[in-house]
Amino acid sequence: MGAPFVWALGLLMLQMLLFVAGEQGTQDITDASERGLHMQKLGSGSVQAALAELVALPCLFTLQPRPSAARDAPRIKWTKVRTASGQRQDLPILVAKDNVVRVAKSWQGRVSLPSYPRRRANATLLLGPLRASDSGLYRCQVVRGIEDEQDLVPLEVTGVVFHYRSARDRYALTFAEAQEACRLSSAIIAAPRHLQAAFEDGFDNCDAGWLSDRTVRYPITQSRPGCYGDRSSLPGVRSYGRRNPQELYDVYCFARELGGEVFYVGPARRLTLAGARAQCRRQGAALASVGQLHLAWHEGLDQCDPGWLADGSVRYPIQTPRRRCGGPAPGVRTVYRFANRTGFPSPAERFDAYCFRAHHPTSQHGDLETPSSGDEGEILSAEGPPVRELEPTLEEEEVVTPDFQEPLVSSGEEETLILEEKQESQQTLSPTPGDPMLASWPTGEVWLSTVAPSPSDMGAGTAASSHTEVAPTDPMPRRRGRFKGLNGRYFQQQEPEPGLQGGMEASAQPPTSEAAVNQMEPPLAMAVTEMLGSGQSRSPWADLTNEVDMPGAGSAGGKSSPEPWLWPPTMVPPSISGHSRAPVLELEKAEGPSARPATPDLFWSPLEATVSAPSPAPWEAFPVATSPDLPMMAMLRGPKEWMLPHPTPISTEANRVEAHGEATATAPPSPAAETKVYSLPLSLTPTGQGGEAMPTTPESPRADFRETGETSPAQVNKAEHSSSSPWPSVNRNVAVGFVPTETATEPTGLRGIPGSESGVFDTAESPTSGLQATVDEVQDPWPSVYSKGLDASSPSAPLGSPGVFLVPKVTPNLEPWVATDEGPTVNPMDSTVTPAPSDASGIWEPGSQVFEEAESTTLSPQVALDTSIVTPLTTLEQGDKVGVPAMSTLGSSSSQPHPEPEDQVETQGTSGASVPPHQSSPLGKPAVPPGTPTAASVGESASVSSGEPTVPWDPSSTLLPVTLGIEDFELEVLAGSPGVESFWEEVASGEEPALPGTPMNAGAEEVHSDPCENNPCLHGGTCNANGTMYGCSCDQGFAGENCEIDIDDCLCSPCENGGTCIDEVNGFVCLCLPSYGGSFCEKDTEGCDRGWHKFQGHCYRYFAHRRAWEDAEKDCRRRSGHLTSVHSPEEHSFINSFGHENTWIGLNDRIVERDFQWTDNTGLQFENWRENQPDNFFAGGEDCVVMVAHESGRWNDVPCNYNLPYVCKKGTVLCGPPPAVENASLIGARKAKYNVHATVRYQCNEGFAQHHVATIRCRSNGKWDRPQIVCTKPRRSHRMRRHHHHHQHHHQHHHHKSRKERRKHKKHPTEDWEKDEGNFC
């Protein structure tokens, strides 16, 4: 019975609860029906939207029609009641009733009720474009009669706009680089609406930057000189309009959402960049990007400690400005390397770090490995390694093509660059199928990823597997890159003309954290691809990277070592062993549709490699490399113009010498040294190894690699030759130069080359035709000089590295094969040179000569060795053509038979460039100081260094001038001796005519040009020549190699006492506050009254006795001042330092509620309220403002009847010169200004008597007392007697005279100080 009873009782109670709930619900419906107004509160949390977007704040309600309320339409009111920080606000936005919407002035144009006219029950507010200050709490209130409903809608505006500057310099980003910089900063490039929204919130930045629509703009809220733009003195976003994507500016980025947390890491010992990365990883995070730090700052992060970020920059976020935290405005501060606010700190410097931990882990682009060695090159970009994205389609992007003003190559078609690359996917980008396209890699930084193979892994290679790709043409020249060399010098490199870039094509995929990377700029448009049998890959010119894996650390899987070796950019560990073959160079021509690889990779194999370069000039450029034991460096400097010699045969007394485009560089060997010579001819026919061959076309020449033994003339098969343990004992110094050759021999495949004991071989019998290169390996007992950071004692450390010279191609335009309309046309694939009717004018290329008469010429490679090198000297006439001599090194005494007559010497081929008229090449040997050689020296070796030679210098050495032409380059090559010297020989019938202006003399001479002839120093800088080098002494306000940088002199805040600094050309100007003077505002021209303290042009005094606010203001006015106003954080800190009690200030809203005004009628420019203030808490009103002492002087509104101390503020006080008094003068020196309470004394002139007080005082209001002194002449005795007699005689008539007639003395004249009553009290 118990259980059924319990169940019955439970059911009964449930029915009662349901009945009560139903009654309550019916009552609620009835109440709502009776009210007739019901708000539909969504309660879905905050509304979130991004900056500059539109957002709808919902407000829905229902109306029940009632006869009594038929004419009573609902009144809708939107109000913002709280800010994002939680401070109370009551800002009316709009009011709507009877289809009439009235918007508050500050919200006009930004808010609307889109559905209200049609549906009065839908009061949804449409707000936008959003600003960051729009975040907060909004209230929608609907009133009908006595019915009142309201709902609160929180709004959160996400995203922040920030300015980004490259690590290289101000204005150093193209449009593509700007997009990449923003992406690597966890952001996107900002749109104009983003920048406008940021400006409307007070964003002010005088740096022009890219926006997403390819316009360049910058926001200015306060106009100032240098920042007027297109809006003169008006505030607004300045615009340069739509710009060429290759122009250089900064960028404005937009970061939308953080997606994690940014936290500060401040260990006891500060960190280098590498240490900061490791510290973040240990905490399960990564270094934060710039965009992530800005978002964290936007969300409230405040930390006055500089820390590393992922891009190598050092920054810190400031919410509340304070002393020693970077300025008076909130924001993210940046620590720059140089005084002109450019450059990031060196990775070896120590700072704290800011790490980012994602809520949902995702791949972070920001934390990419960059070298942190002290020998690394400068960080060329502010962002890390960029990921090259596929080009968008033609419909989306504007294709910019350079103008062609001259005919193309002689075949009538443009030569195309075939990029041989291993890749996964492709995308086609071609204007029209079938059209040839001049190929080069797009402008931007290129990152090279390298994986060094182990010597043990260098086995037999396989045929290269590659895809053919064509990259679009770069329409504009590039700027110079800077790379740090072994000796601390910075080497500069500049790209060739568009479409003619040569060098290495780099990986477009950013390396992983394990990869060894360094940024290389500019990109070089030559791709090298090879697959090892073990699966490893290696870049043939790994010296372009800073970080290379340890030798021997590779595995069969091709994985790199987790702890790579760090090498300077101009070095590469040796990777060519005795088991290896040279890279195969391949030239191809492509037409029709083409595409850029999505993720191209670079691979290097000592066995085989495929190299693609622009066909017109395969010898244009290849990387610089040096050996650690003897640096052999090529340095490109500019801008300069050089006068170059014509290639022409001249005679010599020594053995016959021919010049060519091939070069080697060796160190002077000891008697025990061995020399190995390798040759890389570029063939036009298929070659292979053993039974293996790689098919090519006649238009795709290949390169073979031949090795020559030192002691045996017998042929050595490549597969049979080996050398033991080259790593610890062989220092390699490799110089590779390319020269085209032509022979008629049919190819038969790879074979050994007969050699001699001298290590010199004849390549005339080579079955190939193409580019010639030599490689020297010297087993050198000399001690090695290692770069900083390498351990020479480590058995795994490489003891040498190949040295590869960089030979830039210089052309005046995009058509390198045509010099002039009358000049000859040269095809590198033909053996015939067809000159035009003109005489010596023409373009000079390696392996080609121009003659007055048209005749066929056969070019063949020859090798000649001699100790004397003859360099032609030419005098250039107007309109002559000049060329770029290919590099050559010096040989030992040996010779090879030549088919040409004795004593005939030909110069090497050159690259053409026009010389401006009225320029000549001065002759003679320059005086070159030790340590700064500018050409290859015979007999001794030297290295480019900052003023100190590394090896002995012989002033008597013959110099080989190697210079460039109109493109404003200087190529400086230092070579050792002895070595191998090989030249190109011209085989032709008849005698070659001498070129105009070319002396047919013998001997070693050189061309010397004054580098200061055209004064490359800008802005009035002084050029100081030092041989073929120069330096600029810059005037004040300028810096840089050529004084091209205008330093902002205002960065160091030279103006004192609150003066405003304005930067001008070669100087600055200080605008001083009132009462200050001098060029730095250092002179205080006006002072304060006694007991008052001066600060930035005003006087302040703290009164400790307590008064009500109104009485305190009256007391300040009696003292010619007011309760203090505050207009800057500095002024606030100064006032807050007076006392330690709550203090009255002059801010109040006694006239209009919430309309706070200063009593001295100055504008409200600065606010420092406590949290949730002002709140008008008391019912009686809180109309006066007090500084709260225990909260750093923050403001609070309180009732005005409190008795508190106060601070008065007034202007500075000084009196001018004292007023002049007739017949009197001042005692002492006369001053222009007198301090308050100063006293001066008058003295009557001689012969005058003084009456009344002779002193006056400077009053506290800046005015003098009114002078009382009167100076008069004394009466004479006879006049007194005559006057007395006259008085007695007329005494009886005295009463008949008027008062005026009876006056004894005339009224004294009016003093000048009485005429100006306004100057006195």
UniProtKB/Swiss-Prot annotation:
Q: Where is this region: O-glycosylated at one site?
A: 708-712
Q: Where does the protein principally reside?
A: secreted
- Mind telling me which GO cellular component terms the entry cites? extracellular region; extracellular space; Golgi lumen; lysosomal lumen; perineuronal net; synapse
* Residues bearing carbohydrate: 122, 340, 381, 411, 1026, 1223
The chain's disulfide connectivity reads 59-140, 182-253, 206-227, 280-355, 304-325, 1012-1023, 1017-1032, 1034-1043, 1050-1061, 1055-1070, 1072-1081, 1088-1099, 1116-1208, 1184-1200, 1215-1258, 1244-1271
**Biased composition regions of type Polar residues, renumbered to the chain:** 363-373, 722-731, 906-922
Q: Which residues form the EGF-like domain?
A: 1008-1044, 1046-1082
* Compositional bias annotation for Basic and acidic residues: 1309-1321
Q: Where is the signal peptide?
A: 1-22
The record, for InterPro entries, names: C-type_lectin-like, C-type_lectin-like/link_sf, C-type_lectin_CS, CTDL_fold, EGF-like_Ca-bd_dom, EGF-like_dom, EGF-type_Asp/Asn_hydroxyl_site, EGF_Ca-bd_CS
Q: Where in the cell is it found?
A: Secreted
- Calcium in keyword set: yes
Q: How is it modified after translation?
A: O-glycosylated; contains chondroitin sulfate.
Q: Where is the composition biased (Low complexity)?
A: 935-948
The residue ranges of the Ig-like V-type domain are: 38-153
Keywords of the record? Calcium, Cell adhesion, Disulfide bond, EGF-like domain, Glycoprotein, Hyaluronic acid, Immunoglobulin domain, Lectin, Proteoglycan, Repeat, Secreted, Signal, Sushi
Domain Sushi, first and last residues per copy:
1213-1273
Q: State the residue spans of region: Disordered.
A: 362-414, 456-479, 494-513, 532-579, 682-731, 820-844, 876-955, 1275-1321
Which biological process, per GO, is one annotated for this protein?
A: cell adhesion
* Entry keyword annotation includes Transmembrane helix: no
Domain C-type lectin, first and last residues per copy? 1084-1213
Which organs or tissues contain this protein? Detected in cerebrospinal fluid (at protein level). Brain.
Domain named Link: residues: 160-255, 259-357
Functional description taken from the UniProt entry = May modulate neuronal adhesion and neurite growth during development by binding to neural cell adhesion molecules (NG-CAM and N-CAM). Chondroitin sulfate proteoglycan; binds to hyaluronic acid.
* Similarity remark: Belongs to the aggrecan/versican proteoglycan family.
Q: What is this protein called?
A: Neurocan core protein
User: Gene of origin?
Assistant: NCAN
